[in-house]
């Protein structure tokens, strides 16, 4: 069986690597984007992305804009992974169609468990 592809979007390379390392251990194929514009490009170039893990605060295009753009054409599961912990930000995420909202700092093991739970329901 082919590995499921996950797109990890964060402007911090260290954060992308941390998340990627935990996902790769669970046999996921991970694509990375360092900003919102790159994320949208990668998403439309790779139609078989199973899930997106998305930061909010990034250069060029923030996570909210990425979510709006992707939701125009896709119901791919999206997990927001962000330092923005205000209730209004979390509610905005759900209004835009995200599936899960996780604030930093976070447990990578819990993140992976949530990824697996969402993918079990969506596939």
Locations of regions flagged by a protein language model:
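Charged docking surfaces used in two-component/phosphorelay signaling
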Residues: 17-25
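Receiver (REC) domain active-site loop signature in two-component systems and cognate sites
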Residues: 58
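Active-site residues of response regulator receiver
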Residues: 10, 55, 82
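Acidic catalytic/metal-coordinating carboxylates
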Residues: 35-38, 62-65, 89
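Acidic, metal-coordinating helix/loop segments flanking the phosphotransfer/catalytic sites
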Residues: 32-51
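C-terminal output helix
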Residues: 105-119
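Short amphipathic alpha-helix used as the core "switch/output" element in two-component signaling
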Residues: 41, 64-75
């Amino acid at each position: 069986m082919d590995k499921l592809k996950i797109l990890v979007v964060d402007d911090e390379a260290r954060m992308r690597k941390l998340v990627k390392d935990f996902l790769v251990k669970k046999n996921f194929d991970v694509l990375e984007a360092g900003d919102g514009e790159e994320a949208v490009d990668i998403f439309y170039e790779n139609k078989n992305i199973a899930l997106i893990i998305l930061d909010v605060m990034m250069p060029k295009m923030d996570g909210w804009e990425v979510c709006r753009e992707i939701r125009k054409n896709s119901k791919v599961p999206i997990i927001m992974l962000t330092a923005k912990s205000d209730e209004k930000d979390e509610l905005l995420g759900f209004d835009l169609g995200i599936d899960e909202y996780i604030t930093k700092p976070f447990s990578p093991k819990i993140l992976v468990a949530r990824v697996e739970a969402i993918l079990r329901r969506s596939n």
